[in-house]
Amino acid sequence: MMPFDFTADISVEDASALAKNLGINHSEISIKEMFESFNKGLSKSFEGLETDKTEENLQSRCRGVTLMALSNKLGYLVLTTGNKSEAAVGYSTLYGDTAGGFSVLKDVSKTLVYELSNYRNIISNVIPQRIIESCLLYT
């Protein structure tokens, strides 16, 4: 997990619960220093400009760079989380959300992702409901 200043504690708790429910080992890696380095490096180019989505997208890109470095070092394959609906409308951060070797949900619509998530939870609550509900806020 790579929380940042704006990551709610409850989001970290839910992600940890999901990893535990799936039997996935996880750790927490700070992206704060990397993010600050990017901002410092870009400060002259951004001078006089308002803070906007650019800085928010840098967080995602820091996560993507970190995941790709771990992938290269450890021989893992990074899976992206984008789905068919997001790809169709361009709702993603290039080199952030899209950083990875395979998109498991590439042919699955966002509506079906929610249906599959809820279906998976019928037998046992593997995916914390707050994760599903919070994703609905960004549609």
Regions found by a protein language model. Give the residues of each.
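Long, low-complexity, charged/polar intrinsically disordered regions in eukaryotic proteins
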Residues: 114, 122-134
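A conserved beta-strand->alpha-helix junction
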Residues: 1-54, 60, 130-136
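Active-site adenylate/phosphate-handling loop in enzymes that bind or generate adenylated species
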Residues: 22, 45-122
